[in-house]
């Protein structure tokens, strides 16, 4: 398996930096992508970075990742709480899955406390802002290094 990692972003994350900055901060998704690519290069990971407001596109990328990727770092956003379909897709992926949330979902509305994705995730990172993506990439890289021996 290669050092390829998919970084997948769910609905409304295209508005990062503009939507509720008091919760999600002022960094844009382009900033997150830039930082993920820079860290990926440092760690020897190839990054495929995607965002969609459509559930089926996220599922298609998960299916694509099955063939070549070592890991998925995913911020499913609102699909976290609703999507059995994304859970089912992730259950077909054999690599590492890290679930990321920019805000601490457990300090927010009750409905945000439930995650279908967590049922498959190898780890969950929440409340560290966009740094959570970088923590997720570091974890995938560490697991890859450990698997190499």
From Swiss-Prot:
Its EC number is 4.2.1.10. The active site is at residues 24, 101. Catalyzes a trans-dehydration via an enolate intermediate. It comes from the Bacteria. The record marks 19 as: Transition state stabilizer. CDD domains: DHQase_II. It catalyses: 3-dehydroquinate = 3-dehydroshikimate + H2O. Homododecamer. SUPFAM superfamilies: Type II 3-dehydroquinate dehydratase. Substrate binds at residues 75, 81, 88, 102-103, 112. It holds the Pfam family DHquinase_II. Keywords: Amino-acid biosynthesis, Aromatic amino acid biosynthesis, Lyase. PROSITE patterns: DEHYDROQUINASE_II. Pathway: Metabolic intermediate biosynthesis; chorismate biosynthesis; chorismate from D-erythrose 4-phosphate and phosphoenolpyruvate: step 3/7. Belongs to the type-II 3-dehydroquinase family. GO terms for biological process: amino acid biosynthetic process; aromatic amino acid family biosynthetic process; chorismate biosynthetic process; quinate catabolic process. GO terms for molecular function: 3-dehydroquinate dehydratase activity. It is an enzyme of class 4 (lyase). InterPro entries: DHquinase_II, DHquinase_II_CS, DHquinase_II_sf. This is 3-dehydroquinate dehydratase 2.
